[in-house]
Design a protein with these regions (language model features):
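Carbohydrate-active catalytic/glycan-binding domains of CAZyme proteins
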Residues: 69-326
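Beta-rich interaction/scaffold domains
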Residues: 1-76
Length: 326
């Protein structure tokens, strides 16, 4: 995305092969240096071709398409006839599942699934911030698709004591994201931010992978992480529910699995009751079970109360209200 006043863009082209012939094409014209490419309001698809000639005389060409979206004037977006004025909505494009709801150093952060179109597509993580949960400011896209696939649902936690070791040798931490990547199977990637969520660095670490799932089920997504008893815990589903644990947010082991308990976007959190702490297992924000989260035979498990063993409570009656997250 570029702002409305950006009439041209420059592409930063870095050759990994000095013998490559790189050409940039847009609207029938060639821009060999990738500089001063004019862009109109809306989507602009710029073609980048990299051609290399081998020793045998044969050539190979790799073609990229770069989508540069020039915004319309800001005043046009939220003055549309049917634009919701009460709830947050994206300026344009697609938005769905909330992926990282976290308050960090006085700022509320909301990350969510996003694609630059009015239909579902390769997902990004978009980002908005607020000081009061009412007035929101859109931030730059946080996470883009990569070689591991699109960036699907996940969560963000504040690793305040640097248990992950991702923030150097000290005890001061930052924000850590656990993200579903969906390329040739679903797996959980790790990213972190050292500047309070403004920019993100993906690690090469795979926190969990469907190929090592004890249930051998390819529906392995939507991680939600929480801190309890000086440990990190992660619920994963998409299909059947699993619970993992970790000391450092990067190395995880499976604690328990629930082959008959299916959901997307799971959440597990404690609530205070007159009888003590109970745990709520949210199934996508539509229904829930109440029970205990405890160790059974040395493994952490969610044990539903008898009243919820074979049935769920109703969390909301609006089916479009989905993928709730604490």
């Amino acid at each position: 995305y570029v702002k409305n006043n950006a009439e041209t863009v420059d592409l930063n082209i870095e050759k990994k092969n000095e013998n490559a012939d790189v050409q940039v094409e847009y609207d029938g014209k060639t821009y060999n240096d990738g500089k001063n490419i004019p862009v109109k309001v809306g989507k602009n698809y710029i073609t980048v071709k990299s051609t290399v000639q081998g020793e045998n005389g044969q050539t190979a060409t790799l073609t990229y398409r770069v989508n540069v979206h020039r915004r319309a004037a800001d005043k046009t977006y939220y003055n549309e006839a049917y634009r919701n004025q009460y709830h947050y909505s994206v300026k344009d494009g697609w938005g769905n599942d909330l992926n990282g709801l976290v308050k960090y150093k006085g700022t509320y952060h909301m990350f969510y699934q996003f694609y630059d179109d009015t239909k579902w597509g390769p997902m990004h993580w978009a980002h908005a911030t607020s000081k009061d949960l009412i007035h929101w400011e859109e931030q730059p896209i946080a996470l883009y698709p990569d070689a591991n696939g699109a960036m699907f649902s996940g969560c963000i936690v504040a690793d305040e004591k640097n248990t992950s070791g991702l923030f150097g040798d000290g005890n001061e931490g930052g924000l850590v994201a656990l993200i579903t990547a969906d390329g040739n199977g679903q797996r959980i990637k790790v990213a972190y931010s050292t500047d309070e969520g403004k920019t993100w660095k993906k690690t090469n670490k795979i926190a969990a992978d469907w190929s090592k799932d004890p249930l051998n089920n390819r529906d392995f997504r939507d991680p939600k992480v929480f801190r309890w008893e000086n440990k990190w815990f992660m619920v994963i589903a998409g299909g059947p529910l699993r619970i993992y644990s970790s000391d450092n947010l990067t190395d995880w082991k499976c604690e328990s699995t629930y082959a008959d308990l299916h959901t997307e976007c799971p959440d597990l959190y404690p609530i205070e009751t007159k009888d003590g702490v109970k745990w709520v297992l949210s199934r996508g924000g539509r229904s829930y079970k109440v029970g205990d989260f405890k160790q059974v035979d040395g493994k952490w498990k969610f044990v539903a109360d008898e009243a919820y063993t074979n049935s769920d409570g109703v969390m909301n009656f609006g089916k479009d209200s989905y993928a709730a997250m604490t």
